[in-house]
Amino acid sequence: MKGGEGLLKETVYIATLLHDIGKFIELSKGYAVDKKFKDIKVGHPKYSAQFLETLSKENSFFKNCGQELTELLLHHYEPRNDLERIIQLADWLSSSEREKGETKEKYFTIPLAPIFSRLFDGQDKKYGYALAPLSISEGFPKEDISLTTAQYKNQVDSFLKELSAIKNTTQLYYLLEKYLWCVPAQTTNYISDVSLFDHAKNTAAIALCLYDEYSAGSLTSEDLNKMTDNADN
């Protein structure tokens, strides 16, 4: 996906939508990572990059995205250039809405929590969303939900099967919504009330804004370096 400003912007958009897809795949515990990614320190970008390489062999949409998309997915945690820093910064800004919390259960068993579950003091019941493709019947929380790797494996397999047939970014967006609406973006040491889909779309929106500022010259390489260096401070 090279040769024009619009195509490069679309590459950043797709990469940001998919930047955490490796978390979803890793939760299934059903896919191994190739040894060639061993030098990448953080786990889920390896899954993201490997999944994209596999799709590129089967699907012309992902094949046309080129190697640059794989590189953006693989290195957004340890950026080497400005585009990777844009995605890293967008990710950090999008993640700043999460509330910290205690986690006693295994991280892959914790469901997405409904945002209304903490409105009332003294509420001892715990509610969560089951893993299932988005539908009217599944869009309601249930009491005492605990997820399993087998459930994640079924969800991932169904997602990948449909993903292999997509032809454009619009289809990609709505397919991500269909399968990631019920997947928590983070469960370890944070309250799990933000879905992986909501985090992905918010991060993509921020990344596009940063990219436009960068393309217009209002955001420089020096600015990106300063902001990513100070993002945790």
What are these regions (language model features)?
Residues 206, 218-227:
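Short, solvent-exposed beta-alpha or beta-beta edge segments that form flexible loop/patches at the rim
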